[in-house]
Regions:
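Surface-exposed amphipathic alpha-helices with a cationic face
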Residues: 153, 157, 246-247, 273, ...
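Hydrophobic faces of well-ordered beta-strands that scaffold small-molecule active sites
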Residues: 251-257, 279-283, 308-312, 338-340, ...
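N-terminal active-site wall of soluble small-molecule enzyme domains
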Residues: 274, 278, 282-332, 371-375, ...
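PRPP-associated nucleotide enzymes
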Residues: 1-139, 144-245, 267-273, 286-291, ...
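Conserved anion-binding
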Residues: 136-138, 250, 317-409, 423-425
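Active-site-adjacent beta->alpha loops and helix N-cap segments on the catalytic face
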Residues: 262-265, 287-302, 317-325, 342-361, ...
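C-terminal helical cap(s) of enzyme catalytic domains, especially alpha/beta-barrels
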Residues: 441-450, 457-476
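Active-site mouth loops of central-metabolism enzymes
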Residues: 43-46, 251-264, 311-320, 370-385, ...
């Protein structure tokens, strides 16, 4: 890594402008509404010494880009304070350029008096007003979704200033937009403006890791955030393969514990826990809401330490922010693993996955279900491609555990192809047997080496639950 990048990150840390939080209570909400465990505030450079140093880093970024600059434009709000200092720093390095930023309100007095329409820009700009053909280099602090950058681009072009070759920022957070497109790549494509940054998220991560500059937990939280929200390059560099191992074996049967009472649940666990092929226990809202998750987990722990998987029918269908509280509740209850069906969209999916990982929970993601008329192709509401996107986004975040409909082998094949295309080696969990017509052996054949059949009534309604568990596990 270039020496100036290391120096800049060290500078950010020493000034307190870069913060990586160990505790979720310190997290910051970004303009994009994402809740982030790391934050850069260029506004913390608010004295002469730090502003001068910051300007030098920006000047190097602009000069090293090789792009010709006539005028620097500070994008409101954080970029306004950058324009003049960066111009001064560039002058000290042999590059004399103008600087400017926009007014909140059009000026009507002083030098703005009696200006013609062609000079209207002088009423709206503080500093040197760019000429029509001037190369305008825009300055801002960070790039997340890019809202302020698009607004600045539109503003300058409305004044007839369309020569906008470069945007220089301090930190590229390397995040994808809501539609999963890479935010900076999309901005460059739409505007024709090249973006350069002093450092990016991966640079920050690598320097912090190599120098042991933040607590291990804080670094882990930063890594998980980038895995979920990061661009492909960022995810690949940090490492997307979480390889969460929910079940201690490659194939098993998981009883779906949809029983009415806590006593019935405990008896189910007691009779099946010693069956070698039983991998864990899936509980749902009836037990969870009826008796409280801590009590349900405690009942299971009397007989087994096999994982407890909570399927809230269907978690991940609420707004993104609620994922944080959900994950905290699950962790406090003693649940090991959560199942999400993120039908509320990509931002909800990313948020719920991130917060679950942040709490140390295992995550299983579903998109297709066992019953008729779920997907559009079956007469339902959810588009087939939309359901596949639920799996795709999860795979890009490093998730490797997925729920698939065991009675629809063709769908299992589709999902497998999608997640393997993202570089993930999947582990599948499939309901849909017995009452819904699926065959464990047929689903397992399509799913591959790592497969767990979810069986409900076929076990808990059997006269001999132990014998039923043995029978179902023999089909693996």
């Amino acid at each position: 890594m270039e020496e100036y990048k290391v120096k800049f990150i060290d500078f950010l840390l020493k000034t307190g402008a870069l913060k990586v939080f160990e505790s979720p209570s310190e997290d910051r909400t970004l303009k994009s509404k994402r809740i982030s465990p790391w934050f850069v505030n260029i506004g913390d450079f608010n004295d002469g010494e730090s502003s001068n140093a910051l300007a030098g880093f920006y000047a190097d970024a602009v000069i090293n880009s090789g792009v010709k600059a006539d005028v620097l434009y500070g994008i409101p709000d954080k970029g306004v304070g950058l324009a003049a200092p960066v111009a001064m720093a560039m002058a000290s390095k042999g590059h004399n350029v103008g600087w400017c930023f926009s007014r909140k309100d059009e000026k009507t007095h002083g030098e703005a008096t009696n200006l013609g329409p062609e000079d209207r820009i002088k009423k709206l700009i503080v500093g040197r007003a760019p000429k029509p053909n001037d190369a305008i280099v825009q300055l801002d602090d960070v790039f997340t979704a890019g809202d302020a950058k698009y607004e600045a681009n539109t503003f300058l072009k409305s004044l007839g200033r369309s020569n906008l070759p470069l945007l220089a920022i301090a930190v590229d957070r390397q995040e994808v937009a809501i539609d999963s497109r890479e935010a900076i790549a999309e901005y460059q494509e739409k505007t024709g403006t090249k973006v350069v940054s002093i450092v990016n998220a991966v640079d920050v991560y690598n320097v912090l890791k190599e120098g042991n500059l933040v607590p291990e937990k804080a670094l882990e939280r930063l890594a998980n955030y980038v895995r979920v929200y990061g661009t492909k390059d960022a995810r690949t560099t940090i490492g997307t393969g979480l390889e969460q191992k929910v079940i201690g074996r490659d194939r098993s049967v998981i009883p779906a514990c949809d029983v009415e009472t806590l006593e019935q649940f405990e008896e189910l666990v007691k009779q099946t826990a010693d069956v070698e092929g039983i991998g864990g226990y899936k509980i749902g809202f009836e037990l969870g809401l009826g008796f409280g998750l801590p009590a349900v987990v405690a009942a299971a722990r009397k007989h087994t330490d096999k994982p407890i998987i909570y399927d809230h029918q269907k978690a991940g269908t609420d707004i993104p922010d609620t994922g944080k509280n959900y994950a905290r509740t699950m962790k406090n209850s003693g649940v090991d693993t959560v199942i999400f069906f993120p039908q509320a969209g990509p931002e909800t999916e990313r948020a719920w996955i991130y917060h679950a990982l942040d709490k140390g929970l295992n995550v299983i993601v579903g998109g297709r279900m066992t019953h008729p008329a779920y997907a559009v192709s079956e007469g339902g509401f959810i588009t087939d491609e939309g359901a596949l996107d639920m799996y795709r986004i999860a795979a890009r975040a490093g998730i490797n555990n997925f729920v698939v409909p065991g009675n629809k082998p063709d769908v299992i094949k589709q999902v497998r192809d999608v997640v393997e295309a993202e570089g993930v080696s999947p582990v599948f969990y499939a309901p849909g047997f017995i009452a819904q017509g699926g065959k464990i052996e047929a689903a397992a054949k399509v799913a591959g080496d790592r497969f767990h059949g979810i069986v409900g009534r076929g076990i808990y309604q059997a006269k001999d639950m132990h014998a039923a568990a043995v029978e179902h596990t023999s089909q693996l």
